[in-house]
């Protein structure tokens, strides 16, 4: 958390012209376009009581006003009746830059540089302080359906009471058609992490006929089947993996499972079981979002880890800011919907009609600005993650030609400029993301990007 003070010397250094108050209560914040991808965004505390839990940003802050030579990226907002008497430029400044003779000073008020939220903000600062920036990204957009489908009619009494159908019936006739519709509207691809059964002690076994049905459905929908390592009741994770292995072997299916979901606390145990036949083809793991691991990394020498970026059900403003930041830094997301509570409800809100409505709303509202990036399954994303983690590159510029040299052909980069547009590209292709931001596909080891002749060179000190 950053707190600055104004004593003449430090005020000039940070660009602060006046300290109005050591602490004020905000009603929200406004992020201006340019620092992160995705455009301008307002995070105002919702009026509706059932939506107020979305607001989880830091709202108790000092009120700084900045002077000339600064550029503001985020400001605090008051309630409408208070804001009427305050000019926009006088609102509390939360993220800004002060141009100095030999560079720039960036200041952040609040905890916006915590966890992975820092990644895109720091890349944005680098861009703002430079004539241009170009950096490698993953370019993968993932949608993970965890603990779906299931093939055992467990907890039937409760499911029959709620839906008049069994677990397998609810999955096939209620949930699956809705998921198809949501995915078609979002232009994303699904990876469904199968949970053959949840309770390994109740004597109810999974039915392999449903496996055959879903594998055909996945193929039609360009979806992928993965393995879920979660369970409700078993003597151990190893027992669960052994029992699942027997089920898949008896189903006489030759499907190769390349992705598996595990809770963060179980990752080490899953890695220790990776030589078991069921898991031998798994090349990537996913887990819920955690600050203990990078967004994408190696879990072992041969297996990657792709963290979930957002929970499709419980969406907050800090989660949205983190998602935008990760998209800006990596061109990557992994949205999770865990369906275990549908089949094993904990409260009255664990109903599919409630979950489906909220999930669809969140997905189509918050992620739709990033459809310039590629929709992938987790195994497709895995290949791009490996390229990203292993790529080395250099870049240089001579007049209006930027030269990118990369050790990995078929790699992806983001180019960010200040008003310059791409006129031509050799050795690759480009897609405009938004104003001053381009997705670069390096198809060869050397890419030459010609931008239009700038009228004036960019000077970060005076923008």
What are these regions (language model features)?
Residues 2-27, 149-152, 180, 184-274, ...:
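Metal-dependent polysaccharide deacetylase catalytic core of the NodB/CE4 family, i.e.
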Residues 8-10, 39-40, 56-140, 332:
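A glycine-centered loop/beta-turn motif at secondary-structure junctions
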Residues 110-111, 132-133, 139-141, 145-149, ...:
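Catalytic grooves of carbohydrate-active enzymes
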Residues 111-217:
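Active-site beta->alpha N-cap acidic-glycine motif
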Residues 119, 231-252, 301-327:
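Alpha-helical scaffold elements lining the catalytic groove of polysaccharide deacetylases
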Residues 277-314:
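His/Asp/Glu-enriched short active-site or ligand-binding loop at hydrolase and phosphoryl-transfer sites
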Residues 375-419:
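Surface beta-strand/loop "capping" patches
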């Amino acid at each position: 958390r950053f707190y600055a003070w104004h004593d003449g010397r430090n005020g000039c250094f940070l660009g602060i012209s006046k300290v109005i108050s050591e602490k004020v209560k905000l009603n929200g914040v406004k992020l201006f376009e340019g620092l992160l991808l995705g455009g301008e965004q307002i995070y105002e505390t919702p009026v509706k009581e059932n939506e107020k839990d979305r607001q989880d940003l830091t709202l108790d802050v000092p009120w700084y006003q900045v002077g000339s030579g600064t550029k503001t990226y985020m400001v605090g907002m008051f309630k409408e009746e208070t804001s009427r008497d305050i000019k926009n430029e006088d609102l509390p400044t939360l993220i800004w830059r002060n141009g100095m003779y030999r560079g720039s000073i960036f200041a952040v008020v609040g905890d916006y540089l915590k966890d992975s939220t820092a990644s895109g903000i720091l890349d944005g600062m680098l861009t703002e302080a430079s004539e241009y920036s170009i950096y490698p990204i993953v370019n993968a957009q993932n949608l993970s359906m965890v603990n779906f489908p299931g093939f055992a009619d467990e907890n039937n009494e409760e499911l029959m009471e709620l839906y008049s159908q069994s677990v397998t019936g609810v999955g096939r006739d209620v949930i699956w058609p809705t998921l198809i519709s949501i995915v078609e509207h979002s232009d994303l691809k699904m990876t469904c992490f199968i949970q053959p059964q949840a309770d390994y002690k109740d004597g109810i076994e999974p039915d392999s006929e449903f496996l055959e049905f879903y594998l055909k459905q996945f193929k039609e929908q360009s979806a992928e089947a993965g393995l879920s390592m979660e369970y409700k009741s078993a003597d151990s994770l190893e027992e669960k993996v052994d029992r699942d292995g027997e089920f898949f072997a008896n189903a006489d299916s030759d499907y190769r499972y390349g992705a598996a979901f595990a809770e963060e606390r179980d990752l080490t145990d899953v890695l220790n079981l990776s030589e078991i036949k069921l898991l031998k083809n798994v090349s990537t793991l996913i887990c819920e979002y955690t600050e203990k691991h990078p967004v994408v990394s190696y879990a072992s020498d041969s297996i990657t880890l792709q963290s979930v970026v957002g929970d499709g059900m419980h969406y907050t403003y800090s989660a949205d800011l983190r998602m935008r930041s990760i998209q800006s830094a990596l061109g990557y997301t992994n949205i999770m919907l865990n369906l275990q509570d549908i089949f094993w409800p904990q409260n009255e809100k664990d109903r599919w009609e409630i979950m489906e409505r909220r999930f669809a709303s969140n997905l189509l509202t918050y992620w739709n600005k990033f459809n310039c990036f590629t929709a992938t399954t987790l195994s497709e994303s895995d290949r791009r993650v490996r390229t990203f983690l292993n790529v080395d590159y250099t870049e240089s510029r001579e007049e209006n030609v930027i030269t990118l040299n990369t050790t990995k052909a078929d790699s992806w980069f983001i180019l960010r400029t200040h008003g310059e547009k791409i006129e031509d590209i050799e050795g690759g292709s480009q897609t405009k993301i938004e104003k001053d931001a381009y997705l670069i596909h390096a198809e060869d080891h050397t890419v030459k990007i010609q931008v239009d002749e700038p009228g004036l060179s960019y000077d970060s000190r005076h923008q």
